UniProtKB/Swiss-Prot annotation:
To B.subtilis SpaB and S.epidermidis EpiB. This is Nisin biosynthesis protein NisB. It holds the Pfam family Lant_dehydr_N. Keywords: Cell membrane, Membrane, Transmembrane, Transmembrane helix, Transport. The gene is nisB. It is found in: Cell membrane. Involved in the post-translational modification of the lantibiotic nisin. It is a single-pass membrane protein. The chain crosses the membrane at residues 838-851. GO terms for cellular component: plasma membrane. It comes from Lactococcus lactis subsp. lactis (Streptococcus lactis).
């Protein structure tokens, strides 16, 4: 067995509190209602989980429910009944959580005590706080919501919690807002002091208007009060009540709140099944304060401890290693496409404020699959590469064999494939958390990988429970500390994101304990050191990966979220910060992607662990009048017992049970209306693995794995330029520059550069000016032409005639006049940018000559030859023929490996250089002399300004990159090959003379 680089840690155990063997079987829904109405434990579970459904059932029992609502009631109650016995995922009073450990021998008995961890329902609490912020605003202190940011003359919030219909809100950035915002930026300020600050500027006669404006900021959460401090993390009943008591002179809230606290304490000591009346009492008291769908949240905590043995630990670590290695096959994701857009717009030498970056107009918007909010422009789906063609063939071959032989798909044979894959490609995973169900097959205990598999966000599963007991606090801290230590070694500051979701109904899953150095809060605040949203800048590091920096402290940050909220529901900015911090390639499992379109997938196993149970898709179109549901599932050879699955939600069904078949039929009908499918999954015996009081329980575990092999000390003490303001960097049309986007298909761009660009260059030269161009795609291919001369309007009139001719000849389809956003940071500042632009202009004069040379049938020059040798000449000019300096540069920027064998090409290029044929045709061209002069001017300027060597290299790299863009187009892989070949070429020239 290959040694794992992941070490399994103590794990979370989640199990049902009811024994599945005690579950009754029913043939009619009336039997269900009759039974559950006598089951005090289930009734209390239901009253907590869904108070409205509990009330509807009471109406039915009293004969007061309308007939059309009865069927829905029956089905809902039946599903909850099944859940109470058969699902172990944490939810209310249905299941409990404990900590398990690895030891010499396994032990599956739960012998500890179960306690209730009770919190106020977060939606109820937040709504109450918002109400009190209005009622007691004059007695409270306020701070600025960190979700606010200024953009132009408006103040936006990254999302809103006031309306599920809106993705963002904004108000005008006024002098009054500026005064209040700056006053409340770093701490809580009393209401009276805020008003006083405004009236000091405008006079007492504006007091009433100031209070009205301040009230609107509070209602719309531009300001948040001290009541919100630590609501989502480290919440304390006593601290909260002390704050309320200080402002509630009429005792409107404090008396009932203290009564609620007392009732909750009493309820926490009552056995489950005996607490219905006390629970109703709590609901009654809380509803009089504020009505809501739910009132309290409960997680059951057990001090039991089960054990897995050494062999099981090794088996799980083996699985973690295999799953971790699958990330090596991921070559391109949506974030890689986003990175390319970032580099094209900003280069790699500047940091961009995250709020500007995500703006669809002034930035580049959000990555393709981000939806909160959606980009307000259309874009086609970017290409991705999650696995190789070789992998695809392996998986398909295994699938065919398994289906043909009615066998499982065994992934053991792929282990060596992933182990060998790109040995120099290091995985960036700091660790994993895997979700596993416990089951039994052929009298043997087995693990089944959960439907949501897991994640690489260590602490994500334990954060919600971390404040419920000292043991769980310590457990969570141990997991988080492993990440903290690694980040500290890399000089990275960790930051926990704490936020209210857009829909505060989901806020119950947002609880966590803060165990990191800093916090990024949205729509809430904490007692910890906080990072301001507006101080977060995004850049590209030396490995071409995204990073985030706090511009006020220069710290490189990584962001984590250890609540259980679905990341696809995060606002775009938060999701991005979270995903780039995790380098989130884990979870793109090749078998899921390759098999996802199949209607049947056999069981997948690895080292006797079930990676994925057998699955069947049932489409609505599969059902017809000639075949019953039972006949349909029999025709697909679906077993007698199975699950109907939706994400991590699954319901056990049996073909023998008529009520189960009704649930299945109802689900198929619903999917038919959506023109969708339902997924069925094979059933495993899971009822008697873990025992409590001599009775079995359904259970699952969450096992964290911490990487044991250090990823190395990769400190990030690099410096990037802060992006210059829009006002200084952007040139409006006909203001110094004229910027044209000429939309031309890729296959006709060279024709335009050969036949039309020289004429445009003559027009500009006659007006004492110059121009340069770039090739681009966003998303349509075009040539970007930037022109500078004494009379841009006159030049435009003449250029327009040439463009008309190119359009008449069907070369150019259309063109735009745009704003020139100068890449000031990329080229070291305004002075060196101007000198770089001179290089671009000289280079743009050479390109038509190079294309002519390539096109000329009288020689055998190929585009690869010309691109290599002109790059060679560029390097010779920049480094004044010093090969050692050239090699130092190439060692930094060149890739370490390419697929092509370049040995023969090196010999070919060396011969070409000796013949010097290329030099005769290009090197002595007057335009090349102009280019050499421009390069020399830039080089001397960089020396005069004492640029760091890293900065010099970066500017040279950028200049060569845009030259290659002009000559060969957007070919990043080819550019890597060019650099690699040049490195080999200069090594040969220097050391093999």
């Amino acid at each position: 067995m290959i040694k794992s680089s992941f070490k399994a840690q103590p794990f979370l155990v989640r199990n049902t509190i009811l024994c599945p063997n005690d579950k009754r079987s029913f043939t009619e829904y009336t039997q269900v209602i009759e039974t559950v109405s006598k089951n005090k434990v289930f009734l209390e579970q239901l009253l907590l989980a869904n108070p409205k459904l509990y009330d509807v059932m009471q109406k039915y029992n009293a004969g007061l429910l309308k007939k059309k609502r009865v069927k829905k009631l029956f089905e809902s109650i039946y599903k909850y009944y099944k859940r109470s016995y058969l699902r172990s995922t944490p939810f209310g009073l249905f299941s409990e959580t404990s900590i398990g450990v690895f030891s010499k021998s396994s032990q599956y008995k739960l012998m500890g005590k179960t306690t209730k961890g009770i919190r106020l329902d977060t939606q109820w609490l937040i709504r109450l706080v918002h109400k009190m912020e209005v009622d007691f605003s004059k007695k409270l202190s306020f701070t600025r919501n960190n979700a606010n940011y200024k953009f132009g003359d408006r103040v936006f919030q990254v999302y809103t919690i006031n309306s599920s219909e809106l993705e963002e809100v904004n108000i005008k950035y006024t002098n009054v807002y500026q005064i209040i915002s700056e006053f409340c930026e770093n701490d809580y300020q009393k209401y009276e002091d805020i008003c006083e600050t405004v009236t000091l500027c405008y006079g007492d006669e504006y007091r009433e208007l100031s209070e009205q404006y301040l009230g609107s900021l509070i209602v719309n959460h531009y300001l948040i009060s001290n009541l919100q401090k630590d609501l989502l993390s480290d919440f304390s009943w006593n601290t909260f009540l002390t704050k309320v008591e200080a402002i509630d002179e009429d005792k409107k809230y404090i008396i009932p709140l203290k009564k609620v606290q007392k009732f909750i304490q009493e309820y926490s000591e009552i056995e489950i099944g005996e607490g219905i009346e006390k629970l109703k009492e709590i609901y009654q008291e809380m509803s009089q304060i504020l009505e809501n769908d739910n009132y309290i949240q409960i997680d059951l905590i057990s001090d039991s401890e089960i054990n897995f043995d050494v062999k099981q630990k090794q088996q799980l670590e083996h699985l973690a290693e295999f799953l971790g290695n699958t990330t090596k096959s991921v070559r391109r994701t949506y974030l890689d496409d986003y990175k390319d857009k970032f580099i094209e717009k900003y280069g790699v030498d500047q940091e961009v404020q995250i709020t500007e970056l995500f703006d669809s107009t002034f930035g580049i918007g959000a990555p393709y699959n981000y939806n909160h909010p959606r980009n307000d422009f259309y874009e086609s789906e970017p290409s991705t590469l999650y696995y190789s063609e070789e992998e695809r063939e392996k998986y398909l071959s295994m699938y065919v064999e398994a289906v043909k032989n009615h066998n499982v798909i065994n992934l053991d044979d792929l282990e060596s494939h992933y182990q060998k894959m790109d040995l120099e490609k290091k995985s960036e995973l700091q660790g994993l958390e895997l979700f596993l169900n416990l089951a039994k097959e052929y009298e043997k205990d087995i693990f089944i990988l959960g439907d949501i598999v897991g994640n690489n966000n260590l602490g994500g599963a334990s954060g919600r429970f971390s404040a419920l007991s000292p043991e769980l606090t310590s457990y969570h801290r141990t997991i988080v500390d492993s990440v903290e230590r690694e980040n500290e070694n890399k000089e990275i500051t960790s930051c926990e994101i704490v936020f209210l979701p857009e829909n505060i109904r989901h806020a119950n899953v947002m609880h966590t304990s803060i165990m990191r150095r800093k916090v990024l809060p949205f729509f809430t605040s904490t007692s910890h050191n906080e990072v301001l949203l507006t101080n977060i800048y995004i850049g590209i590091d030396e490995k071409e990966k995204f990073y985030a920096r706090d511009i006020s402290t220069q710290e490189v940050l990584k962001f984590y979220i250890t609540s259980m909220y679905n990341k696809t529901l995060f606002s775009n900015e938060l999701r991005f910060l979270y995903e780039i911090s995790l380098d989130d390639k884990f979870g793109n499992l090749p078998w899921e992607l390759i098999y996802r379109d199949f209607d049947y997938i056999p069981r997948l196993v690895f080292d006797e662990i079930v990676i994925s149970p057998a699955k069947w898709k049932i489409w609505g179109r599969d059902v017809n009048s000639k075949m019953t549901i039972r006949e349909l599932i029999q025709s697909k050879e679906i077993p007698k017992e199975f699950y109907i699955v939706n994400g991590d939600n699954k319901v056990y069904l049996s073909q023998k049970n008529p009520l189960d078949m009704e649930i299945l039929e109802s689900a198929i009908k619903k999917s038919s209306k959506r023109k969708d499918f339902i997924e069925l999954q094979e059933y495993f015996e899971d009822e008697n693995i873990i025992n409590k009081g001599e009775k079995g329980r359904v259970a699952d575990v969450v096992v964290p794995f911490i990487r044991t092999r250090a990823l190395g000390n990769e400190g990030r003490a690099f410096i990037r330029e802060k992006r210059v303001s829009v006002e200084r960097r952007e040139k409006l049309p006909f203001n110094e520059w004229l910027y044209l986007k000429l939309y031309i298909s890729i296959n006709r761009q060279n024709e335009f550069l050969l036949s039309y660009l020289p004429d445009i260059q003559k027009i500009v030269a006659n007006l004492g000016g110059n121009l340069f161009f770039l090739r681009y795609t966003d998303p349509k291919p075009h040539i970007r032409l930037r022109i500078k001369c004494s009379d841009l309007f006159l030049a435009y009139g003449s250029i327009l005639e040439i463009l008309k001719r190119s359009r008449k000849n069907r070369i150019m389809s259309t063109f735009d006049i745009s704003i020139y956003d100068q890449e000031v940071e990329r080229y070291g500042g305004f002075d060196t940018l101007e000198l770089s632009e001179a290089i671009f202009c000289a280079d743009s004069k050479i390109i038509p000559n190079l294309l002519t040379l390539i096109k000329d049938t009288n020689n055998d020059w190929k585009v690869d030859d010309v691109s290599i040798l002109v790059n060679y000449l560029y390097l010779k000019c920049f480094f004044q023929n010093d090969n050692k300096k050239i090699l130092n540069f190439l060692n930094l920027v060149s890739t370490k490996k390419v697929k092509e064998n370049v040995n023969e090409k090196i010999e070919h290029y060396l011969k070409l250089l000796k013949v010097n044929n290329l030099g005769d045709q290009i090197f002595y061209d007057k335009n090349f002399k102009e280019l050499k002069h421009a390069i020399k001017n830039l080089f001397l300027k960089m020396i005069a300004q004492d640029f760091e060597l890293q900065k010099v290299y970066s500017i040279i790299d950028s200049i060569i990159h845009v030259h290659n863009n002009r000559l060969i187009g957007i070919e990043r892989d080819k550019e890597k090959l060019i650099y690699y070949t040049l490195q080999r070429l200069f090594v040969s020239e220097e050391y093999m003379k």
